[in-house]
C-alpha cells in the first residue's frame, strides 16, 4: 500500500472545552507521545514506521500522520483514547478522521486561519510551525509530512498576503475587553490581574492596557518574565504564590498558563468574593486545560468565561469577511490539487525504483556472461550481439508475457499502453498483408 496522509483530531467545532482539555498535550509530553504512537505500529504488517506530528492548542488537538498501514485510522483513534485514558465511546463522536486530500485541505485551512475561532488569526501558524519543529526533533517527521507542512506554510503566506482574511478580526483579547465592559461600565476604574506571561496574555494585556485600568498586575511562575511583561504596560509583577491571599484585590482576572491542573480553585474564589463584600469579579480563562475550576462560574457575583464563551463574540466579527473567505478557499483548493499531483507522482517512485533494480540486475548478469565469453576467446562481435539479444529478450519478456496472458478489455488496455511506450508500435490491423 502507498503512503497515505491522515489527520485525526478534535477541535472547537466538534468538542467542548471540557473534553478538549482532557486530550490536550502539554509541550513536554509531545515528544514522548510521538514515540508511543509510532510504537503502536511496530507489530503491524506495514513495513515503514509512520510519520507523525501533534498540534495541540487551546482550540484543537490534532495528529497528522503519513503511513502505509491500512488500519491506521482505527489504530490512531484507539491510541488517542488510550493515551488520555478516555473511553473510546466517549471520545469517538467528537473525533474527525481526514484521509488524503481532506487532510491536506484541512492543514492548509488551519494554517491560513480559516478553521480558527478567530477567523484569520495568525497565532495558529506559529503554533503549527512549533509542532513541526517538535516532530522533527523527535525524529517522527519524514518526506511526506515535511513536504505537506512546507506547502502548508507557503499556502498560508499566499492566503494572508493576497486576501483580507485577517483584516478587522475580533481577537479573543478584544472579545475579553468587550465582555468586561458589559460587567463594568468603565474598565479604567478596575484593577486587572493577568496570570501567565505567554503570547495570549501579552495580547490581552495590550487590549486592556489601552483602556487605562486603575492597576495592572502580572503574576507568573517565572518572576523575571512576569516583571518584564508588567513593566512593558506600566504595571507591576506579583509572585504567583501570593494569588490566594490577594485575589480579592482584583476586579478583572485573565488567566492563560500551561498548567495541567487548575491554579484557581472554588474555595479561593469563595473567600475572595466574601472579602470583596460581593462586589463582582470578572474572570476569563483562556487556558486549555482550564486554569480555573469550572464550578467557580456557579458562584454569585462571579462572571467566568472560557475560550468557548468568547467564541460567540468573535463569530460576530467573522461574518463580515465572507468574501475574503471565499477567495481564500479558492486559493486553497488550487493548492490542494497541486499537492495531490505531487503525492500521486510519489506513489510511483517505488515502482520505478524496482524497475531500475530489476533492469540493472539483468544488465550486470549479462555483462558478466559477456566477460566470460571474451575471456575464453570468443569473437567480440559475436559476444556483443549475444549480449544485446539477451538484454532485449529479457527486458521485453515481462511486457510480452503480460500481453499473452491478458484477455478482452485488459488486453486492449495493455496494447494501448504498449503503444504509448513504443510509439511506433503498429495497430493490430496494420499487421495484415496489403
From Swiss-Prot:
Active-site residues, Swiss-Prot/TrEMBL: 58 (nucleophile)
Subunit field text: Homodimer.
Annotated keywords: NADP, Oxidoreductase, Porphyrin biosynthesis
Taxonomic source organism: Burkholderia pseudomallei (strain 668)
Annotated metabolic or biological route of this protein: Porphyrin-containing compound metabolism; protoporphyrin-IX biosynthesis; 5-aminolevulinate from L-glutamyl-tRNA(Glu): step 1/2
Bilayer-crossing regions: none
Pfam families associated with the record: GlutR_dimer, GlutR_N, Shikimate_DH
Gene3D superfamilies: Glutamyl-tRNA reductase, N-terminal domain, NAD(P)-binding Rossmann-like Domain
Annotated protein name in UniProt: Glutamyl-tRNA reductase
Remarks, miscellaneous: During catalysis, the active site Cys acts as a nucleophile attacking the alpha-carbonyl group of tRNA-bound glutamate with the formation of a thioester intermediate between enzyme and glutamate, and the concomitant release of tRNA(Glu). The thioester intermediate is finally reduced by direct hydride transfer from NADPH, to form the product GSA.
Keyword NADP recorded: yes
Domain notes: Possesses an unusual extended V-shaped dimeric structure with each monomer consisting of three distinct domains arranged along a curved 'spinal' alpha-helix. The N-terminal catalytic domain specifically recognizes the glutamate moiety of the substrate. The second domain is the NADPH-binding domain, and the third C-terminal domain is responsible for dimerization.
Catalytic activity entry: (S)-4-amino-5-oxopentanoate + tRNA(Glu) + NADP(+) = L-glutamyl-tRNA(Glu) + NADPH + H(+)
Gene of this entry: hemA
GO molecular function, one term: glutamyl-tRNA reductase activity
Amino acid at each position: 500500500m502507498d503512503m497515505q496522509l491522515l489527520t485525526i483530531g478534535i477541535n472547537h467545532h466538534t468538542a467542548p472545552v471540557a473534553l478538549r482539555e482532557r486530550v490536550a498535550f502539554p509541550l513536554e509530553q509531545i515528544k514522548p507521545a510521538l514515540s508511543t504512537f509510532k510504537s503502536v505500529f511496530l507489530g503491524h504488517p506495514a513495513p515503514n514506521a509512520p510519520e507523525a506530528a501533534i498540534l495541540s492548542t487551546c482550540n484543537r488537538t490534532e495528529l497528522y500522520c503519513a503511513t502505509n498501514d491500512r488500519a491506521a485510522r482505527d489504530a490512531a483513534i484507539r491510541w488517542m483514547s488510550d493515551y488520555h485514558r478516555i473511553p473510546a465511546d466517549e471520545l469517538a463522536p467528537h473525533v474527525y478522521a481526514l484521509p488524503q486530500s481532506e487532510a491536506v485541505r484541512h492543514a492548509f485551512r488551519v494554517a491560513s486561519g480559516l478553521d480558527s475561532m478567530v477567523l484569520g488569526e495568525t497565532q495558529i501558524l506559529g503554533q503549527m510551525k512549533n509542532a513541526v519543529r517538535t516532530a522533527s526533533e523527535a525524529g517522527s517527521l519524514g518526506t511526506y509530512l515535511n513536504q505537506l507542512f512546507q506547502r502548508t506554510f507557503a499556502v498560508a503566506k499566499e492566503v494572508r498576503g493576497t486576501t483580507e482574511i485577517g483584516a478587522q478580526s475580533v481577537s479573543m483579547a478584544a472579545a475579553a475587553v468587550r465582555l468586561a465592559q458589559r460587567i463594568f461600565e468603565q474598565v479604567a476604574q478596575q484593577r486587572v490581574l493577568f496570570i501567565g506571561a505567554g503570547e495570549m496574555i501579552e495580547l490581552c494585556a495590550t487590549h486592556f492596557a489601552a483602556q487605562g485600568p486603575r492597576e495592572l498586575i502580572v503574576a507568573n511562575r517565572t518572576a523575571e518574565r512576569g516583571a518584564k511583561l508588567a513593566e512593558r504596560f506600566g504595571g507591576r509583577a506579583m509572585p504567583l504564590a501570593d494569588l490566594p491571599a490577594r485575589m480579592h484585590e482584583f476586579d478583572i482576572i485573565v488567566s492563560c498558563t500551561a498548567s495541567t491542573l487548575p491554579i484557581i480553585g472554588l474555595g479561593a474564589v469563595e473567600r475572595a468574593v466574601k472579602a470583596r463584600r460581593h462586589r463582582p469579579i470578572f474572570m476569563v480563562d483562556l487556558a486549555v486545560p482550564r486554569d480555573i475550576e469550572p464550578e467557580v462560574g456557579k458562584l454569585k457575583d462571579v462572571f467566568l468565561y472560557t475560550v468557548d464563551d468568547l467564541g460567540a463574540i468573535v463569530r460576530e466579527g467573522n461574518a463580515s469577511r465572507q468574501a475574503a473567505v471565499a477567495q481564500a478557499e479558492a486559493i486553497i483548493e488550487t493548492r490542494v490539487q497541486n499537492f495531490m499531483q505531487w503525492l500521486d507522482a510519489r506513489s510511483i517512485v517505488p515502482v520505478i525504483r524496482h524497475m531500475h533494480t530489476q533492469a540493472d540486475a539483468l544488465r550486470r548478469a549479462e555483462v558478466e556472461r559477456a566477460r566470460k565469453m571474451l575471456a575464453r576467446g570468443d569473437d567480440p562481435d559475436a559476444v556483443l550481439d549475444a549480449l544485446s539479444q539477451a538484454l532485449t529478450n529479457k527486458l521485453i519478456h515481462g511486457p510480452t508475457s503480460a500481453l499473452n496472458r491478458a484477455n478482452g478489455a485488459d488486453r486492449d488496455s495493455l496494447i494501448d499502453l504498449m503503444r504509448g511506450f513504443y510509439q511506433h508500435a503498429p495497430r493490430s490491423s496494420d499487421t495484415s498483408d496489403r
